């Protein structure tokens, strides 16, 4: 039985995973979690010890994939507002999380990630994680600059001058942009990295 007969689950922080390419539909595969056939499967990052090739959207949405493989779809240390803490001997001492635990679990265990050139980074705004909109270049954002919460600060955070965006930021290029939107105020945020 193929699972994609039912509607795809909704993901609060990644609402259009088919459009962003987080899920692929080019073949029918067996989900490594539920062992059901599916023609919609996850192709983004999944951090775990086991070798996991295919996950269906439903096993991501209900958290069963993260639970079964003790994995995550987003690295805790690569989320704005979440930091690793270390003791005096530089040993890992835990996570400093400024968000409610359930909110962090929703993002890390039940939200499909996205592909970055280096390490994906999830942005936040208004006390909540932002929605991932997609991959962008300068041409995708140049007419929307007034919609950003603070584009200059976003650029500084990923290591580029705001004045260099027009010549550097290219969708699929060496400097790739990742567009996010605040769930509460609707302002845009930008992350980027380099190949």
From Swiss-Prot:
Induction field: Induced by the two-component regulatory system CreC/CreB.
GO biological process assignments: bacteriocin immunity
InterPro entries per UniProt: UPF0167, UPF0167_CbrC
Any Pfam family the entry gives: UPF0167
Stated family: Belongs to the UPF0167 family.
Miscellaneous: Disruption of this gene leads to hypersensibility to nitrofurazone.
Protein's UniProt name: UPF0167 protein CbrC
